[in-house]
Amino acid sequence: MVRLWFPMKKSRKSIAAHAPTIGARQVNSAYHRRVASPSELSTSTSRQLQRTSPALIIPVGSVEQHGPHLPLDTDTRIATAVARSVAARLADRNESNWVLAPAIGYGASGEHEGFAGTVSIGTSALRLLLVEFGRSAAQWASRLVFVNGHGGNTEALAAAAALLRYEGRDAGWCSCTAENADAHAGHTETSVLLHISPTDVWVDECLAGNSAPLSKLMPQMRQGGVAAVSELGVLGDPTTATAQEGERILAEMVDACSRRITRWVPDRDGMLT
């Protein structure tokens, strides 16, 4: 995963004063620690993968605004954290040979256009990317599962997985979901980031956004995107977020994805149910 770094502001509050450092920058050990998993595609060799027919788990995220307090790659970080933990859990159960792929870090984020930093490749391009990724990887991987961290990617994932399955490839996908989660850059995502990347949360910039139900906001968002309903780019309330809550939410996401992958019952669009 390619991470985006920005100059630190002097006024920024530190969440983890005793975190280890890389150079002069504090690093969160929880995010950078490599959880035990069978292997990672980026550090494997072709010879190691020969004749093993591994199952491949691929995080899918985005580069988009997450309010004034969260990094642009928030969705990718969450998808990667969930995918890594799921791969480790499945490996512990000896459920196939799982390999964690580098994240697909760009997604369909058109609703966030107009906010600086957002880079959206759109649904059509993402669909094509996922299809070609799947066609290539399926030549040596026995199964493909995309772990999605951004709601705007679901249309592309559904179309791509449906085509891959029609072509005879064993592909599926699931999203990082939690019960009663708010929509964007609010309590849910901020809590998870406080757990996995505390030094990259600008806690002094946290402000409550629009907390209306997403169903009520959608008519305006279809016309003008997130900016039409929240000047901050926040849908929810990040001021209530805690690292402890983030740990619980992440575990819930991992549990849900693990169950769906273990059960492996894809619907007509390849979504695991």
Predicted ranges, named:
Residues 2-6, 16-20, 24-27:
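Short amphipathic, helix-prone segments within low-complexity/disordered or flexible regions
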Residues 7-8, 254:
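Generic low-complexity, intrinsically disordered sequence content enriched
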Residues 9-13:
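Polybasic, lysine-rich low-complexity intrinsically disordered segments
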Residues 27-273:
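Extended, histidine- and acidic-residue-enriched regions that form the cofactor-binding/catalytic faces
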